[in-house]
Every structure is written in structure tokens, then in C-alpha cells.
Design a protein with these regions (language model features):
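A short, structured loop/turn motif at beta-sheet edges
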Residues: 16-20, 47-51, 80-87, 107-116
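Hydrophobic ligand-binding cavity/cleft-lining segments
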Residues: 1-52
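Intrinsic-disorder/low-complexity, polar/charged segments enriched in Ser/Thr/Lys/Arg/Asp/Glu/Gln
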Residues: 6-12, 19, 55, 74, ...
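Hydrophobic/aromatic beta-strand elements that line small-molecule binding cavities or substrate pockets
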Residues: 11-13, 74-81, 92-94, 102-110
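Hydrophobic pocket/interface hotspot
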Residues: 22-26, 32, 56, 79, ...
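Glycine-rich portal/gate segments that line the openings of hydrophobic small-molecule binding cavities
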Residues: 44-93, 153-159
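A conserved amphipathic terminal alpha-helix motif
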Residues: 122-159
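Short, solvent-exposed aromatic-acidic interface loops
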Residues: 91-99, 120-127
């Protein structure tokens, strides 16, 4: 992955909770639905993940974004990085073949008073066909930032 600002977005927030409490939400398929700021994630099917290669299905509805007429569809989340209580990342497999190759993830750093959470979206590994499509990033920085706020609220309610 790259830190090139043109191919990666990162946002941070301090959450007054332990990395373990935050990671529990991030490794649970229902946690992904709970913290989604886009309104696209409707539900998820699968068990909490515990390793690279683990998968779960997310039931989506793109109508919330009002951008592409995709309707309801499913994607499979495939875990690409799993370092318990430190980092989790995933890519998406869905209707588009081969998969696009963009990656979503979180890093967790314990600090005084809680955890510094970094949410990132990286599209540095997408194919050339996708680079020219002009649709990346598919989510704005504001959506990542909003998701961190919802994650904060979700973790506080769970503890």
C-alpha cells in the first residue's frame, strides 16, 4: 500500500475505550453494519473474523447514495490484515469480476485516555481500467470521519 494522498485517505479520532473493545466491533460483521455512515450496509451474515482470509457477507443497498442504480446486492468482505487489537483491513468481492482491489482498514494505537483510531481507504492496488474510470475514491473522507464518530458511540454503548 502507499501513503500517496491521491490513492489513500486516512482520518483519525481518539476514542475513550480500549483497543480490545474497539476491535470487537470492527471484527464483527454486525459491527460493520452498526458503524456504517453511508446507509448502504443493510445487514451482514457471518461470524466474527479471527484471521486473514476470513470472510462474511454484507447485504447492501446503493439507493442511499443515489449514484449508481445497483439496487440491492451482496458483497463478500475478505480480511486482508488481522492483528488483534492493532489492525484490521479488508477488500471486497462482489458483482464485479475480477475484484476491484480497494482496501478499507483501521489501525488502533493505545494512548492515554483511550485509543487513537485511524480509518483508511486505499485504492493504490486497483487495476488500470479502474484508474481511468474517475470514480475513486468511491467514498469521501467525510464518510470515513463520520464512521469514526459512529464507532465511538457504538463502543461507548457496548461498554
Amino acid at each position: 500500500m502507499t501513503n500517496d494522498a491521491r490513492e489513500r485517505i486516512e482520518v483519525q479520532r481518539t476514542i475513550p475505550a480500549s483497543p480490545a473493545a474497539i476491535f470487537r466491533v470492527l471484527s464483527d460483521p454486525q459491527g460493520h453494519v452498526s458503524i456504517d455512515s453511508s446507509g448502504m450496509l443493510m445487514d451482514a451474515t457471518g461470524e466474527p473474523v479471527g484471521a486473514v482470509g476470513d470472510r462474511f457477507v454484507v447485504h447492501m443497498d446503493r439507493e442511499a447514495l443515489n449514484d449508481y442504480p445497483m439496487g440491492k446486492y451482496d458483497v463478500t468482505v475478505v480480511i486482508t490484515t488481522f492483528d488483534r487489537d492493532r489492525e484490521i483491513a479488508w477488500t471486497i468481492e462482489g458483482q464485479i469480476k475480477p475484484p476491484i482491489g480497494h482496501v478499507y482498514g483501521y489501525t488502533l494505537e493505545p494512548i492515554d485516555g483511550g485509543t487513537l483510531v485511524t480509518s483508511y481507504y486505499d485504492w493504490s492496488s486497483i487495476g488500470e481500467d479502474w484508474r481511468g474510470a474517475g470514480i475513486f475514491p468511491v467514498i469521501p473522507e467525510s464518510a470515513l470521519r463520520a464512521t469514526l464518530g459512529i464507532l465511538d458511540r457504538t463502543v461507548r454503548r457496548a461498554t
